[in-house]
Amino acid sequence: MKRYILIFLFLVVHLFGAELAVEKNFKESIIKSDAAQKPLMFIVSRHTCKYCVMLEKETLSQAEVIEKLNKDFVVYIAYVDDGDGFPEEFWRPGTPTIWFLNDNGEAMSEPIMGAIDKTNLLQVLDSVKTKFDEEKNLQQYNYTKSKL
């Protein structure tokens, strides 16, 4: 019986205790993205924005989303009402704005504007990860080919 209780407690802590790893500034997140060979999910947000709060509380807090982001992405959230810095080229009117950047800090696509639910975000994350990996493989192939 003790064993089942311990297993249950482990699962509860593991599933509900997971935290999203969020970088503290834009430049450091690009450096980490490059070092880890992972894409960067960069969110422009505000504490007073209804949809920003919804995105964080209802989507980014889901265990499956946290696990996927922590495993396959580097995450940075810039709060414009806190004065968090990021390049002007990524500013768009309206928040939240979700960007996916390659490990060189270049946009992989146009941003997602507004909140997104768990199911759709997980689909987007899979798509972005696949595209990132394909681009990395192509770069490696071109590099190898140029050495021949």
Predicted regions and their residues:
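Thiol-based oxidoreductase modules, predominantly thioredoxin-like and allied folds used
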Residues: L20-K24, Q62-D84
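Loop/turn elements at helix/coil->beta-strand transitions in domains of secreted/extracellular proteins
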Residues: A36-L40, K71-A78, D103-E106, L122
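Extracellular/periplasmic catalytic domains that process cell-envelope and extracellular macromolecules
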Residues: D34-A35, E67-N70, F90-G94
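Sec-dependent N-terminal signal peptides
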Residues: Y4-V13
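Local sequence-structure signature of Cys/Sec-based thiol-disulfide redox active-site neighborhoods
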Residues: F26-S61
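Non-catalytic, surface beta->alpha helical segment in thiol-disulfide oxidoreductase systems
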Residues: G94-K136, Q140
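Solvent-exposed loop/turn segments at secondary-structure junctions
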Residues: R46-K50, E58-T59, V80-D84, P93, ...
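N-terminal leader/targeting and pre-domain segments
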Residues: G17-A36, K129-L148
